[in-house]
Each structure stands twice: as C-alpha cells, then as structure tokens.
Amino acid sequence: MELGMGTDITGSDYTKAACRAVFNALRQNSLALAPAFGKSRDDMHCEIVIGVQRPDAVRTDEVAAILPYGTREVRLEKGGLDTPREGPDGEPTGFTILANAAILVRLDLTQDDLDRLEQAK
C-alpha cells in the first residue's frame, strides 16, 4: 500500500488534488513489487482509492493515467477536507481541497513463482 496527500489551494479542482495525492504516493514509495518476484510491472493490479469531499467531481481517467504501468482501477470515497478561504475583506473566495490517496498493489503469483523465490534464497 502506498499513501499520499494532495491539495489544490486556489483552483477548487478535485481532480487536480487527487492527481497530486497519487503523485505524492508514488514519490514517497516504490512500485518495485513485481520485479522482486520476477514479474513484469505490467503484471501488477493497482487499485487507487481517492478520498475527497466531492467524489463525483473527480475525473477518474486522469487519475488512472498517472500510474506508469499495471492495470488500474480508481475507487472514489467521501473523505479528504475542504477548507474555506477568505479574501482580504473577510469574504469567502472559495476553498482549498485536500485529497488523500491509497494505492493498493496486488500481484497474482503461482505456486511455481513462490517455489522459485524460495530456491533463490
């Protein structure tokens, strides 16, 4: 599992915040699971879970396109945080969006794959 957080401070764009959360998760971690098991990175199954206050406002195709390899599925949940912003006069000017992302990575392994790993020890 890889975790990240992203924001859109001034644009109130949920997709931008979600994409930044996925980029953040990728920068802090490594999707090195597949090569460690002698598989291709394209064999990985990646589920991206995004938490934002308005899940319906996230364009999932843009979020999925961030991952460089593997099959991708995006699941949206209500979460994250919207923080109101005020201008110099104290009037509301919009809000800052905080999105959370979790990337769940799975790899299908056969018994032969596991046996090969055991022999390599």
Task: Please state what every model-predicted region is.
Residues 1-38, 51-59, 100-121:
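Conserved mixed alpha/beta catalytic, RNA-binding, or beta-rich assembly cores of soluble enzyme
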Residues 45-89:
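Mid-chain, well-packed structural core segment of small domains
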Residues 40-44:
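Short, charge-patterned binding micro-sites
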Residues 72-121:
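C-terminal edge-of-domain segments
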